[in-house]
Swiss-Prot record:
Disorder cited: Deafness, autosomal recessive, 16: A form of non-syndromic sensorineural hearing loss. Sensorineural deafness results from damage to the neural receptors of the inner ear, the nerve pathways to the brain, or the area of the brain that receives sound information. Deafness-infertility syndrome: Characterized by deafness and infertility and is caused by large contiguous gene deletions at 15q15.3 that removes both STRC and CATSPER2 genes.
Pfam families in alphabetical order: Stereocilin
Alphabetic keyword roster: Cell projection, Cilium, Deafness, Glycoprotein, Hearing, Non-syndromic deafness, Signal
Keyword Glycoprotein: yes
Biological function: Essential to the formation of horizontal top connectors between outer hair cell stereocilia.
Glycosylation sites: N65, N202, N297, N366, N427, N476, N540, N565, N656, N824, N916, N964, N1179, N1274
Protein name: Stereocilin
Subcellular localization(s) per the UniProt record: Cell surface; Cell projection, Kinocilium; Cell projection, Stereocilium
Coiled coil: none
Origin: domain of life: Eukaryota
Principal cellular location given in the protein's record: other
Assigned protein family: Belongs to the stereocilin family.
Annotated source species: Homo sapiens
Any GO CC annotation of this UniProt entry: stereocilium tip
Amino acid sequence: MALSLWPLLLLLLLLLLLSFAVTLAPTGPHSLDPGLSFLKSLLSTLDQAPQGSLSRSRFFTFLANISSSFEPGRMGEGPVGEPPPLQPPALRLHDFLVTLRGSPDWEPMLGLLGDMLALLGQEQTPRDFLVHQAGVLGGLVEVLLGALVPGGPPTPTRPPCTRDGPSDCVLAADWLPSLLLLLEGTRWQALVQVQPSVDPTNATGLDGREAAPHFLQGLLGLLTPTGELGSKEALWGGLLRTVGAPLYAAFQEGLLRVTHSLQDEVFSILGQPEPDTNGQCQGGNLQQLLLWGVRHNLSWDVQALGFLSGSPPPPPALLHCLSTGVPLPRASQPSAHISPRQRRAITVEALCENHLGPAPPYSISNFSIHLLCQHTKPATPQPHPSTTAICQTAVWYAVSWAPGAQGWLQACHDQFPDEFLDAICSNLSFSALSGSNRRLVKRLCAGLLPPPTSCPEGLPPVPLTPDIFWGCFLENETLWAERLCGEASLQAVPPSNQAWVQHVCQGPTPDVTASPPCHIGPCGERCPDGGSFLVMVCANDTMYEVLVPFWPWLAGQCRISRGGNDTCFLEGLLGPLLPSLPPLGPSPLCLTPGPFLLGMLSQLPRCQSSVPALAHPTRLHYLLRLLTFLLGPGAGGAEAQGMLGRALLLSSLPDNCSFWDAFRPEGRRSVLRTIGEYLEQDEEQPTPSGFEPTVNPSSGISKMELLACFSPVLWDLLQREKSVWALQILVQAYLHMPPENLQQLVLSAEREAAQGFLTLMLQGKLQGKLQVPPSEEQALGRLTALLLQRYPRLTSQLFIDLSPLIPFLAVSDLMRFPPSLLANDSVLAAIRDYSPGMRPEQKEALAKRLLAPELFGEVPAWPQELLWAVLPLLPHLPLENFLQLSPHQIQALEDSWPAAGLGPGHARHVLRSLVNQSVQDGEEQVRRLGPLACFLSPEELQSLVPLSDPTGPVERGLLECAANGTLSPEGRVAYELLGVLRSSGGAVLSPRELRVWAPLFSQLGLRFLQELSEPQLRAMLPVLQGTSVTPAQAVLLLGRLLPRHDLSLEELCSLHLLLPGLSPQTLQAIPRRVLVGACSCLAPELSRLSACQTAALLQTFRVKDGVKNMGTTGAGPAVCIPGQPIPTTWPDCLLPLLPLKLLQLDSLALLANRRRYWELPWSEQQAQFLWKKMQVPTNLTLRNLQALGTLAGGMSCEFLQQINSMVDFLEVVHMIYQLPTRVRGSLRACIWAELQRRMAMPEPEWTTVGPELNGLDSKLLLDLPIQLMDRLSNESIMLVVELVQRAPEQLLALTPLHQAALAERALQNLAPKETPVSGEVLETLGPLVGFLGTESTRQIPLQILLSHLSQLQGFCLGETFATELGWLLLQESVLGKPELWSQDEVEQAGRLVFTLSTEAISLIPREALGPETLERLLEKQQSWEQSRVGQLCREPQLAAKKAALVAGVVRPAAEDLPEPVPNCADVRGTFPAAWSATQIAEMELSDFEDCLTLFAGDPGLGPEELRAAMGKAKQLWGPPRGFRPEQILQLGRLLIGLGDRELQELILVDWGVLSTLGQIDGWSTTQLRIVVSSFLRQSGRHVSHLDFVHLTALGYTLCGLRPEELQHISSWEFSQAALFLGTLHLQCSEEQLEVLAHLLVLPGGFGPISNWGPEIFTEIGTIAAGIPDLALSALLRGQIQGVTPLAISVIPPPKFAVVFSPIQLSSLTSAQAVAVTPEQMAFLSPEQRRAVAWAQHEGKESPEQQGRSTAWGLQDWSRPSWSLVLTISFLGHLL
């Protein structure tokens, strides 16, 4: 049992004591009290018990305690200050006894004790005892707990307990509610009387009758243990274990019932704020927040909040007699002789006033008096007469609240300074004193300690010495508190000092005179009780030893905490009951239980007046507080404390008085900590195996509710506590909220609260403690903008105050500030300070504001002061305006330009004014230019400072330009640098010197690399990036650096960048175990492997028995058995690369290792294949689906269709779009078709759908079918626009028609139709601008277009927009006619010059296209094409336009002049394909070698140019038969220029060289035949023996095999190679493709086509074009949607028109339909073309007339439907 039983047993003991340990009114002159008679019979029974039946020590202890109960109390004579013996007063509970004796439970209770005595005397067996009495105990507990809950449990059906009745009984306990009301004070009559001491010689009363013996003290003494349980206690252990089970169950059930009842009752009183349908919520208060946490299972730290403080509860509010102004009833004065019926009731006041006399006439302990009198006035210990002894214990006075303590402190300081210094000043703990004594101690100690020689300037040293503390800290407390009190500093403080440092950090103690500081709250004034005294005394050996002689009761108080051997009675009692009983701690009941209990009861005074009933939570709160104090701190273990604390917290919430009396100010930090931990909880916690739930679906909703309803409360707590950690967590939670919910939250909060939270964010940012990852900076800007909306007016001063957060604002939010913002000098200063963190678009927006004529006038007139003030914005001026800066203006800022971050165009304009080539200080000029030197042309560098030293400062600076991307490695300046390196020889450079050349590594030729030593090469590897190493270089380096023997995992991982150089030889040298271990470090490079390298890597793991057969000849059959997969354990990094044939994972393996698989980036076909393998049940919950991770991306359309609830359907769709992998086209089409079908049906759930959709991702909005675009709300459209701005690659994944529709819809939302498009609208549209139509593009004013040319250069431009833009650029108000362009116009246009027609480009004057300008222009275009966005952009081929652009350089100036012969610098300044075959052939061999990499990588070279370049390569390396593998790889496409005989001479014995040729597209039919025949001949292989590695290596050259030869390929091997071959646009004939497709149908392949799922069609790619006509005609919709778009495009046009019907064509996904080529469309019938157009537009045009449904049941999307409108309105709230 995790929960201790001791609280329950304690209550039972109290009930028994209160029931029987009482003094009854005598019924006759000498009649014994019935209780006394009972005790005597008990004693006689024990005397008759056989010896040895139980533990002898236990019997003797028990007898001794019983015997002592009959002895009257004695007053011992002890030294002064020693407390008298513990003799508590007797209790007279006459009213209660009368009630109890009339109860039917009187007999069962007596029977319980009688049976216990019989058991001890062995008059009955334990079994008989348990049969009779277990029910009595259980019934008592049940009734007790039921009485605490309103209404209680249902009336028990069990019979009432009698002595000889059945054991399954229940106590009626009609007296128990009376007892509880009695304790609450509602019926308290003459409860406690403190009796005078009785003379032991006078055993009779004054009236001659025998006095009742003081047996109560003896009974209470039973609670004091005398020893540990012995080994003979098996009887007691069995008894407790048997009886304990029902008691524990009842106790646990009762506590839960109490808590649940309180929850409901408190909820009905306080209420709970909830968000409305719009997401708005009226904020709650702190009590409601705590109640919300309890209802949502938050674990509040009730100890830190103050609800388990262990301090005695204040007087209950229900006692009117404690109220101010209500006098307490006073008893008459004591009399020497008094009859029992006229006993005096000694008041607390009288007791506390008289107890300090020489002989207190009361039988009560000093400690009880100390407790009783704490509320009247502070207790001061009785000082020892000796001043010396007192000063040795001055520590007592230092912590005492007594006013006299200050006098003692001053006296001891004056008379015994040395002792005072040792006892007080050397103890750093006293720096944490509170009250008036703290300042006195500081002053006294400061006078005794010598001043320190020097105080540390930084954080205090560790450990702190007293002299440093008192001398430095107290001299400048404010300064040192700032250094100590930060969260990081507190963590660094040693644990021994953390307590007092934490106290000091809470602030200085205010000055008080004699009384301690008190808190005035709803309950009045509350003063601390100095309860920390025991902790300080018991933990300090010196203090403890000094104080115990004067106050002996401290020994008992400190016994537990000082690790005494005495065992608490409760602990001894429960020890056998529980396997691991938590320590009970220093509970008062473990220390001195009797006096303590009586002392607590004595604190409840007599009250004669009637008290009205109060609310149940208030009454229960007081009882729980009293119980918690009685049990002591930490008693019962964490679980018991938690349950009690939860009940205490709940019961205090409705009553402000109870709540704020207990709530500690430091509890605010605990609330923030608990909320922070809750918000940090991961909503997805996978379970070990199976489809167990892993996500709490309400967790996200609960967090949203918390933030929406209680953010103002949290903001208030943050303002008070300044917790940076909690602020960070809260801000992160806001950043992850859907924008609409966040907006509702901020707008519904009070204005002052929102402004205060923004101030907190500002402070956190200023202190550098509010950290936001780059991915969430835009969300932080959105939050800041929302908070800014709560300001009625945005001013320049507000901009200055919030300048640390300005970098996170969106441009549109930044533009909300007044236009005159930049006229403020302080604003400009703030921009200068925070400009490094601002985004370029922000600076561009602000820079454009500078151009307002009303601010600063025209650019040429700007003064130098203004230029300096706006320097961070100048690089972001539109280039046309920047070019207006005069040389004088530029030279005025000469020293500032290098660090300004200028772009190429701006930098060139500055250089023209700064560089003076006619002076001699060229090197000094370059040094001053700094980063601007990156933009110098080779000619300028040559004239200023010729490059010659590979380690020189200018050369190093230019290499830094290459490292940061400013200088292109393929440019002319880089070529000059490479010339310096080649001329000096790389061998002379040290490895460290060579490392700085890493940015130009890709341009180093193979010959140069062969000259470098191995240490030099290894030194460069750590600084290289993957893309900076060409495949040829990787082959060369891996062959040199890879150890041939004993390769370790560390060595292989150090070479991971060279993985693309994998060859048969290097792969054979890597042990399989090392490959497995290196999976994690090699994984990032796997995407750079060629298809053949990937296949070879996979082959390594599937060789039978791990034996490789990869000899140099490669002869012999494959070691794998055809058609039979070999069980293989694949490394995780290789699993996403596996062909379906090798993906042998069964359902059990997938489910058992789900955590291993759910995060892998599975391909579309793999996910579909594994989904089928798992046989996912149709009733799978959303939580189960989320547990599948990326495997859920393979979900089938049938599974979606079987989801009944619309809410569940939309949640699943949301989950799919949240996956890191893309939603496959067929699943996307299924989602929207299914949504259309559901909207056409009566759907009662539409009225309940709403908040569930708020969390859907904006990616879903972006992916909406074209037809739904017009129905989106404006807010939803803006969410899509924001998504596109953040991630433009997601826009480029859509079809062109989709992109255009989205752009037009966004423009419609931002600007009315036929109105000019403003600059703000253009900036808001962002990348969508490039897909506007002709009419919309012409709505852009030309001046606005001109000022946004720099932004347009970074966007993907659709064909329509690009054509229209090219026409607009030539207008007079933009750039004008091309024949009039100068260099400035070319630089302004940038890469947009390619939007001009070829004719217009050819008209640009040769003078405007100088070598430098031309190189920069082509570099910018190439950089764009190689960027991620550029690679996704479907721009038209620019070969003709590029040729027209460079015509003035590559063609002679006059027809009669010869063609210029290029050198390598000329080629780098243009591009290889710009030069003719004749010009290439006439190049110098050294120049060609330096540019060989560029020639091999240019896809624009024609056949003649390829032959010319290949001729130069043969001059360089000799005949082709001698080419090494790395040379063949470097030649690349140039190999097409080989003659037939030379091609036959190439050595093609392994897959390494073969794959190089197989990757080349563009071979002639003859060359294809030569390559494959040469390989088969040289390797000695037959076609039937080609494994999937060699089939993959053949690549494009596979089409060199004749159809009859292709038939011999192994279907098993080919079905694996199909994954790689299907990605190629194979130049095979239709007959060859049909043979290849037929191989996949054979038994070793995938079987009959009719059985193929869509994943098979996706796997085989373009090979699907060879499927026979009949088979294609019979394909179902799901199968068709599995065909890749590339496969669609390669189907021969006649075949395409024959095999696909209009219905099949209409089922194409939009991506498939867009892939249909114009040639294919030309062969289609009108109906087929309409079907393709319908699929391209996603249903906008139906293939059947008048909107009739197709065979697929699709409705006309344009027909109005209330359900459609409702759905779109919901989708408008997706975020």
